[in-house]
Amino acid sequence: MDPCECSKSGTCNCGGSCTCTNCSCKSCKKSCCPCCPSGCTKCASGCVCKGKTCDTSCCQ
């Protein structure tokens, strides 16, 4: 099961770039959205969602 609740409260579009719309989850795991929001420290398993947007710097 996807640990991210974006599918219930918003949308996460992953690909070459990542966009989160109305994303209210506190963390974006790779299964939902591999991108780290601006100002988020890169990490292995995911990163903290800050705000409602993601930039193109992604966690690997």
UniProtKB/Swiss-Prot annotation:
Region entry Beta, spans: 1-28
Molecular functions (GO terms): metal ion binding
Keyword Hydrolase included in the entry's annotation: no
Top-level taxonomic group: Eukaryota
Alphabetic keyword roster: Metal-binding, Metal-thiolate cluster
Region Alpha, residue ranges: 29-60
Chain residues that bind a divalent metal cation 2: C6, C12, C14, C25
Amino acids binding a divalent metal cation 6: C36, C40, C43, C59
Residues at which a divalent metal cation 5 binds: C33, C35, C36, C49
PANTHER family: METALLOTHIONEIN (PTHR23299), METALLOTHIONEIN-1X (PTHR23299:SF24)
Domain comment quoted from the record: Class I metallothioneins contain 2 metal-binding domains: four divalent ions are chelated within cluster A of the alpha domain and are coordinated via cysteinyl thiolate bridges to 11 cysteine ligands. Cluster B, the corresponding region within the beta domain, can ligate three divalent ions to 9 cysteines.
Protein family (similarity comment): Belongs to the metallothionein superfamily. Type 1 family.
Function: Metallothioneins have a high content of cysteine residues that bind various heavy metals.
Stated name of the protein: Metallothionein A
Biological source species: Notothenia neglecta
